[in-house]
Structure formats: structure tokens, C-alpha cells
């Protein structure tokens, strides 16, 4: 295809790499960018986060909960969210970490362990690490 911005995605298809931000339980669109398909999801995300948080602050004074995918698990994003007084959930990117080591840490740090059905155990807790970061802009 010759559409502007279309390129090979990481899944091997021609397409785009959109990024979108919604607010509220109703899911109102606050911000969106249609980015080139070959672009990594973290590329330009710090600026998008800042812009989106500023837009949300114009809409509400309520606390913000930001959810990000594992591709956005970066110290820079965490720093922006901490400085902006946002709550956040970021899917962990294990990178080169051992899944077994991560599971042992999760079990050790859990304050609540439930078994909603046979064969499924849910560990709920938190573990905070010091994060140092610099922003690109």
C-alpha cells in the first residue's frame, strides 16, 4: 500500500502504530496519534504522556490512573507519572529477568493470596524499587 505512514509492524503486517488515551469509565477519547507502523510503541510516548496528563487536568481535578502496556515499562515514563501525581499500572516487561525469580519475588511480597478456582492462584502485593530517570526533553 502507498498510504502515508503505513509500514511493516512488529507483527509483520502493513499498518500503523496508533496510541490512544481515554478518560473515565465511559472511555471518552482524550488524545490520539496515528503513528508509523514501524515505530516502537515507546517512541515519543513521554511527550504523549505529558500532553495527555495536561489535557486530563483541564477536564478534571480527580486522581488519574494511567495504564500502560509492557512496551512502555520505562523509567522515564514512571518518572513522568510520579512527578504528575498520577496513579499507574504498567504491565511488567521482564526483559532478561527470569520468570521463576519474578514468581518467587511475587510470592514473597504478596499480602493477599487467593485461589478463585482449582489450578489458579492469585498473588496480590507490591514491590517498589528506586527508579532513576532522565527525560529526553
Q: Where are the regions a protein language model picked out?
A:
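A conserved hydrophobic secondary-structure block that centers on an alpha-helix together
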Residues: 55, 60-67
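Active-site beta-loop-alpha junctions of metal-dependent nucleic acid enzymes
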Residues: 34-55
Amino acid at each position: 500500500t502507498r498510504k502515508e505512514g503505513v509500514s511493516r509492524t512488529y507483527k509483520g503486517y502493513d499498518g500503523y502504530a496508533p496510541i490512544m488515551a481515554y478518560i473515565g469509565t465511559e472511555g471518552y477519547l482524550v488524545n490520539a496519534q496515528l503513528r508509523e507502523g514501524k515505530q516502537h510503541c515507546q517512541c515519543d510516548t513521554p511527550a504523549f504522556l505529558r500532553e495527555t496528563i495536561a489535557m486530563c487536568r483541564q477536564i478534571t481535578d480527580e486522581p488519574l490512573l494511567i495504564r500502560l502496556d509492557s512496551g512502555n515499562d520505562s523509567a522515564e515514563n514512571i518518572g513522568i507519572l510520579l512527578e504528575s501525581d498520577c496513579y499507574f499500572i504498567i504491565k511488567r516487561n521482564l526483559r532478561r529477568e527470569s520468570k521463576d525469580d519474578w514468581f518467587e519475588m511475587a510470592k514473597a511480597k504478596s499480602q493477599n493470596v487467593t485461589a478463585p478456582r482449582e489450578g489458579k492462584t492469585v498473588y496480590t502485593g507490591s514491590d517498589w524499587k528506586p527508579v532513576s530517570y532522565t527525560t529526553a526533553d
